[in-house]
């Protein structure tokens, strides 16, 4: 059909028109000449419709027409035999038709005719016969040859097709009521308006109805058109009769036609823009059927407000047609639209678009019920060349009529612009006028965002309806119909995204494949056995057609993969009928791809290995039919690959011949020994298998080993396992070298699949690639295994053991060397990223240690493994690694799994290594001493390592010498953690006799260097090493010479390290020449220990106080000034610490204080050595303070500073006793107290009055009052001091004024201050 640009045809329908008597004839108006088509014509692509989101399925009407070759389907003449003698009526529609497909029209001739089957000529016009008549009267203004209606039908039966009718042949099963498949025979209702550049406005009535036996036809020519008036006679049953009384002339250039009001009550006129306007005011019929050809711009504006019926044809000759108005667009295969053409549809109840090529087997329909209220129309999607869309977004609220969209074959339209016309109706003077406004044209660059949303919404609704269908029966055709609709929607724009497409495929596949077997469904409902079988095959066919359409929609590797992934799980089902459906569908998709190969050739074949592997696996399926079909799919796949290869080489090949050749080459199927077919296929596909394909083949083979709750019998499982084993072994034997770059992916796939394989024999087959690949690519396999998730579960552990237990086993020596190399790596890279490689290597080593055959090789590198593991323990302290998850829950219900701590896992491997090497005593020793826990803490790791080394020395481990010589070079390597661990182990080995063989520079020299190390731990370890060396007589003097450096290195060190070092140094102080030791060393050691008296850790306080006393015992006369000053500065810390309430610490304090008093000859009050609390012994505290100030007056301010410092201690007991001590100490210092010191005390007490501990607050207030009273009594408080003013305004406790001395009561400023103080407290 060729349409010229600029033409416009508009239809207005009057909703107030009343029905007329039924007519049985179809008059025609037409000229015999068909003008030349427009020169700018092009072949157009297929037209598709885009639905609105409100569309729903329409029930089946169960009325159809049978296509008969050589005859018109729909209206049948007397000579047309019908099984039921029923007559079907064409729908009330507007039909736009063009010349017949495959026929050449003589556009220059005046008379157009066709030879019928009997040699007669048929006119181009199309008379219509109703079932009650054998002829239709025709009025024509042209010179067409006369022929009867039967001739006309025969002339056009095989050349013009019509969609919108239905098949009523009882021998043909019913398909989707929304998709009507027709033969190439068709019926054209009416003549042709064939003016290429004409525009017409037709306005049929809205509520009119024609009898079912009528089919009025309007035919308008484009050449010599004469005036003719038509009327409907009351008794003519719808026959149009010329009427010259009321005519309105329509003229456009050389066009002049008129129609009387009796026929349509319409007025025809043309404007300068060649737009014909026809106004309707009379009675008409709703069965109006008009056919238009070669009109380039068509606008339809009926005013219908009635409900819509999907199909207007029916079996019953006297039934009533429900739709008041509808439009049918009929196109032939060779018709075109010009680039500037457009179609405008407005307020049309039903829109049917139809087209077919000559060689098409089926017809396609687009039937769209349109909403009567155009204000709800939001937009229309334009046709996009190459994608074939024509969209009609239509609002369809709940309760409205439904819409069905069908595909139109390619070549129906070319670039056509769709427009939306909003037409509100307005009535004036009894005449109905249509006003066209708000016309929106959507071009190819139209925004498709809203259209995309509408399509997705429609698809989701259909998917939801599919999901609502029962999965245990097939009782309706809803699935089939829905998938057919989805097939048509796949041709519309925009295309679905990958996620939406995958979801759609999964839903449809699950809905069909989950159905029981056909036999089971038939047994459940025996009465409908045949219906169920037919419906099942139709449903499966609809699914396969949908998958093919989706494949065409997205012919990319990702698009095909989305289909194959949905089918994959079903191919491994334990149910034979589900596997058969999946294999059959796979083969169907492959066959479709083979037919459309040239279109997909540039993309190659995606997911080849996955699909090939699944099909190969099912060659060995217990069901022989499945195996045979799988082999047929492989043959098709091989043909596709060869065609692509030859296409790249630009070789022409016959598909059919190549397929038959491959079928003979790869077949036949051998049900007795399917493994022969498997080996043959794998061998021949070698040229097409790359690394990714090899990986997919292996993983597909593993899928066949999965267990199933409904798995087949034992023999069937064995057959599938055998097929998998043959497939795995043959692929790895022939193509192992190609899998090198995908070994990590293969190992990961095996690890994941093992979780689903439970049978022992199947697990052995699944682990086969591990040993086969490791025999050739050991390093790559080990690296891949190191990536397994941690902690290792049974699957990962079994993969590690597979390297050694199964043949061909790998070289254990090489394997251990690889693991040792991984253990020497840091778990944190230079970029700061955590790595699981060392921890994974430790886990792999732990699994290998369980294999007895490895022990000899392990012992060879035992020292290296032990030291590497100990260093890894240090590295993993406090480290959180990626991919580490908690192990599965315990068997006990409700038991919470312990969190996975990497350092504990490494410690476990150390234990395992020691036990396997026979060090059970050492392991037990560490358990008893808490060495493993020490090893896991960052501050005590070196102690745990040292404890292990000490145990190995104590129990004379045979490997100590090798470890000793290995450690010497390690002391200078690595980072701080590396050196600390190595040094901690090395220091304990200095007790061995073999150390004498080591040069002194590697023992004493290295330890001496460690004293100046910046890390305190290294200093402590060096002291430990020197103390051990000092046990040897030849090195004692050298070590004691280093004693001042050792003591000096303890300054500003953590208390625990100080305690550890001093405990080691005690051994040095013992000896014959201890009296000759310089006292300055002891004093310096005392200075180091004193600050740790107030350490928060009890063990540190207790140890330091105890060590302090022992050092004092080592002091000898004469007492030096440094000694006296140091011991005097110890008095207050010991007195205050004694009151903290800890009996153990208090006891150590008393003992140390006695030692100090003995050495210094102090005469302290006896109560000073008492551990009783000071709460009710204020006089005792005052007596102690008075003794201290009187005895050590020069150190009084030191005592005050120390007590103020303890007032800041974190322990409340120390803060309280320090406040009490200050309250007694300050009055004793009245003669030497300065204003600055007093202000310092005042500030400290003010802060303590807000202490969180209530007792501290109370004692702080009491002490403040006591100090104030003492100052007044002794008159040493300076005038104008802020102490009084501040206390008067803030003090919360009122001192007793009556107890003040009389001399002070006369001082006005003091009494004034006290008065204001009282007032403030009362407030």
Curated annotation (Swiss-Prot):
UniProt repeat feature HEAT, residue ranges: 957-995, 1036-1074, 1079-1117, 1125-1162
Effect seen on changing residue 183 to Y: In a breast cancer sample; somatic mutation
Membrane topology: Multi-pass membrane protein
Pfam families given in the database record: HEAT_Maestro, HEAT_Maestro_2, HEAT_MROH2B_C
Domain of life: Eukaryota
Segments passing through the bilayer: 593-613, 767-787
GO cellular component: cytoplasm; extracellular space; membrane
Bias type Polar residues, positions: 127-150
UniProt keyword list: Glycoprotein, Membrane, Repeat, Transmembrane, Transmembrane helix
Alphabetized Gene3D superfamilies for the sequence: Leucine-rich Repeat Variant
Coiled coil: none
Region (Disordered): 1-42, 66-87, 106-150
InterPro entries named among the record's database cross-references: ARM-like, ARM-type_fold, HEAT_Maestro, HEAT_MROH2B-like, Maestro-like_HEAT, Maestro_heat-like_prot
Subcellular location: Membrane
Glycosylation sites: 318, 438, 586
SUPFAM superfamilies xref list: ARM repeat (SSF48371)
Principal place of residence: membrane
Cited PANTHER family: MAESTRO HEAT-LIKE REPEAT-CONTAINING PROTEIN FAMILY MEMBER 7, MAESTRO-RELATED HEAT DOMAIN-CONTAINING
Protein's UniProt name: Maestro heat-like repeat-containing protein family member 7
Organism: Homo sapiens (Human)
């Amino acid at each position: 059909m060729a349409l010229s640009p600029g033409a416009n045809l508009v239809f207005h329908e009057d909703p107030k028109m009343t029905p007329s008597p039924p007519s049985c004839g179809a008059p025609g108006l037409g000229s015999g000449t068909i003008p030349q088509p427009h020169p700018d014509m092009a072949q157009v692509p297929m037209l598709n419709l885009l639905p609105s989101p409100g569309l729903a399925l329409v029930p089946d009407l169960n009325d159809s027409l049978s296509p008969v070759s050589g005859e018109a389907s729909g209206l049948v003449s007397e000579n047309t035999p019908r099984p039921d003698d029923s007559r079907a009526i064409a729908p009330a529609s507007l039909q736009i038709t063009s010349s017949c497909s495959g026929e050449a029209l003589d556009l220059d001739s005046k008379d157009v005719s066709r030879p019928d089957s009997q040699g007669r000529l048929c006119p181009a016009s199309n008379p219509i016969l109703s079932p009650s008549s054998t002829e239709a009267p025709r009025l024509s203004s042209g010179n067409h040859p006369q022929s009867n209606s039967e001739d006309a039908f025969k002339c056009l039966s095989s050349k013009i097709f019509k969609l919108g009718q239905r098949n009523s042949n009882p021998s043909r099963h019913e398909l989707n009521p929304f998709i009507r498949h027709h033969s190439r025979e068709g019926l054209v209702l009416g003549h042709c308006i064939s003016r290429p550049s004409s525009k017409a406005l037709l306005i049929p009535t809205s509520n009119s109805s024609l009898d079912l036996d009528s089919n009025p036809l309007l035919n308008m020519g484009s050449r010599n058109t004469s005036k003719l008036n038509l009327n409907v006679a009351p008794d003519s049953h719808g026959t149009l009769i010329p009427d010259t009384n009321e005519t309105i002339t329509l003229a456009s250039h050389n066009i002049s036609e008129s129609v009387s009001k009796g026929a349509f009550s319409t007025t025809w006129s043309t404007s300068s823009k060649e737009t014909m306007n026809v106004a309707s005011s009379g009675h008409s019929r709703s069965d109006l059927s008009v056919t238009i050809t070669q009109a380039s711009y068509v606008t339809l504006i009926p005013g219908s407000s009635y409900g819509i019926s999907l199909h207007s044809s029916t079996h019953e000759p006297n039934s009533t047609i429900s739709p008041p108005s509808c439009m049918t667009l009929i196109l032939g295969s060779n018709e075109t639209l010009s680039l500037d053409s457009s179609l405008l549809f407005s307020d049309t109840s039903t829109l049917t678009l139809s087209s077919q090529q000559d060689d098409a087997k089926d017809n396609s329909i687009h039937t769209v019920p349109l909403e009567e209220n155009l204000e709800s129309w939001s937009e229309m999607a334009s046709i996009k060349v190459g994608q074939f869309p024509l969209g009609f977004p239509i609002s369809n609220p709940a309760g409205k009529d439904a819409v069905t969209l069908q595909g139109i074959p390619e070549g129906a339209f070319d670039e056509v612009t769709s427009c939306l016309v909003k037409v509100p109706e307005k009535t004036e003077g009894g005449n109905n006028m249509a006003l066209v406004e708000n016309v929106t044209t959507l071009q190819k660059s139209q925004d498709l965002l809203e259209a995309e949303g509408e399509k997705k919404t429609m698809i989701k609704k259909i998917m939801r309806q599919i999901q609502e269908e029962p999965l245990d029966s097939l009782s309706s055709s809803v699935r089939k119909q829905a998938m057919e609709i989805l097939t048509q929607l796949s041709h519309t724009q925009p295309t679905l995204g990958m996620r939406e497409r995958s979801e759609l495929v999964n839903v449809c596949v699950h809905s069909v494949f989950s159905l029981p077997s056909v036999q089971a469904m038939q047994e459940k409902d025996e009465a409908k056995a045949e219906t169920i079988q037919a419906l099942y095959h139709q449903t499966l066919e609809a699914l396969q057609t949908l998958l093919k359409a989706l494949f065409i929609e997205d012919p990319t590797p990702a698009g095909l993969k989305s289909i194959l992934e949905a089918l994959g799980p079903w191919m491994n089902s334990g149910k034979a009928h589900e596997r058969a459906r999946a294999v059959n569908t796979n083969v169907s998709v492959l066959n479709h791809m083979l037919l459309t190969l040239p279109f997909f050739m540039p993309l190659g074949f995606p997911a080849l290995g996955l699909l090939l592997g699944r099909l190969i696996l099912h060659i060995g399926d217990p069901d022989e039919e499945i195996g045979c079909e799988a082999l047929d799919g492989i043959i098709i796949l091989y043909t596709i690959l060869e065609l692509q290869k030859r296409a790249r080489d630009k070789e022409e090949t016959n598909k059919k011949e190549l397929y038959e050749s491959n079928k003979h080459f790869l077949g036949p199927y051998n049900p007795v020994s399917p493994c022969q077919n498997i080996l043959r296929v794998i061998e021949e596909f070698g040229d097409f298998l790359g690394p990714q394909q090899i990986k997919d083949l292996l993983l597909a083979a593993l899928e066949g080993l999965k267990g199933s709750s409904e798995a087949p019998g034992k023999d069937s499982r064995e057959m599938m396992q055998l097929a998998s084993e043959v497939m795995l072994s043959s692929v790895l034997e022939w193509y192992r070298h190609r899998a090198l770059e995908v070994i990590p992916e293969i190992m990961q796939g095996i690890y994941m699949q093992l979780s689903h394989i439970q049978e022992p024999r199947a697990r052995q087959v699944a682990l086969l690639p591990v040993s086969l690949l490791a025999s050739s690519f050991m390093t790559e396999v080990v690296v891949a295994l190191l990536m397994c998730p941690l902690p290792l579960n049974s699957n990962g552990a079994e993969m590690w053991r597979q390297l050694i237990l199964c043949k061909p086993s790998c070289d254990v020596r090489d394997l251990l060397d690889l693991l040792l190399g991984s253990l020497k790596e840091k778990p944190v890279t230079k970029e700061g990223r955590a790595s699981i490689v060392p921890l994974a290597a430790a886990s792999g080593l732990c699994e290998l240690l369980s294999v007895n055959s490895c022990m000899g090789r392990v012992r060879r590198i035992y020292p290296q493994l032990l030291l590497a593991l100990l260093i890894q323990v240090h590295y993993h302290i406090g480290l959180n690694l990626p991919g580490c998850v908690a192990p599965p829950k315990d068997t006990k219900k409700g038991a919470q799994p312990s969190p996975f701590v990497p350092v504990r896992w490494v410690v476990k491997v150390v234990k395992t290594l020691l036990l396997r090497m026979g060090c059970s005593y050492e392991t037990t020793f560490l358990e008893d001493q808490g060495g493993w826990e020490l090893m896991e803490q960052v501050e005590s790791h070196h102690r745990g390592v040292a404890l292990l080394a000490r145990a190995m020395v104590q129990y004379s481990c045979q490997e100590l010498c090798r470890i000793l010589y290995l450690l010497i070079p390690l002391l200078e390597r690595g980072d701080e953690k590396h050196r600390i661990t190595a040094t901690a182990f090395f220091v304990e080995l200095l007790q061995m006799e073999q150390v004498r063989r080591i040069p002194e520079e590697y023992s004493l020299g290295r330890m001496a260097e460690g004293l100046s190390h910046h890390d305190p731990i290294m200093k402590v370890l060096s002291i430990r090493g020197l103390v051990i060396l000092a046990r040897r007589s030849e090195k004692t003097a050298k070590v004691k010479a280093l004693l001042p450096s050792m003591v000096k290195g303890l300054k500003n060190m953590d208390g625990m390290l100080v305690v550890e070092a001093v405990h080691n140094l005690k051994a040095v102080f013992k000896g014959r020449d201890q009296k000759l030791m310089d006292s300055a060393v002891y004093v310096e050691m005392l200075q180091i220990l004193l600050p740790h008296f107030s350490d928060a850790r009890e063990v540190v306080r207790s140890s330091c106080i105890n060590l302090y006393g022992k050092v004092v015992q080592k002091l000898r006369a004469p007492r030096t000034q440094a000694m006296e000053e140091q011991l005097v500065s110890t008095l207050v810390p010991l007195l205050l610490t004694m009151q903290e309430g800890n009996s153990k610490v208090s006891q150590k304090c008393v003992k140390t204080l006695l030692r100090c008093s003995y050495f210094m000859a102090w005469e302290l009050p006896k109560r000073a050595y008492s551990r009783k609390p000071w709460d009710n012994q204020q006089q005792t505290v005052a007596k102690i303070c008075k003794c201290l100030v009187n005895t050590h007056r020069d150190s009084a301010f030191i005592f005050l500073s120390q007590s103020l410092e303890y007032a800041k201690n974190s322990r409340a007991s120390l803060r309280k006793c320090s406040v009490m001590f200050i309250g007694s100490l300050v009055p004793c210092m009245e003669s030497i107290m300065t204003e600055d010191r007093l202000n310092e005390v005042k500030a400290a007490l003010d802060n303590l009055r807000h202490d969180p501990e209530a007792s501290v607050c109370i004692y702080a207030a009491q002490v403040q009052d006591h100090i104030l009273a003492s100052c007044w009594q002794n008159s040493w408080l300076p005038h104008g001091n802020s102490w009084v003013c501040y206390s008067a305004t803030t003090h919360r406790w009122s001192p007793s004024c009556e107890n003040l001395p009389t001399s002070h009561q006369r001082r006005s400023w003091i009494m004034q201050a006290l008065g204001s103080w009282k007032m403030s407290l009362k407030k």
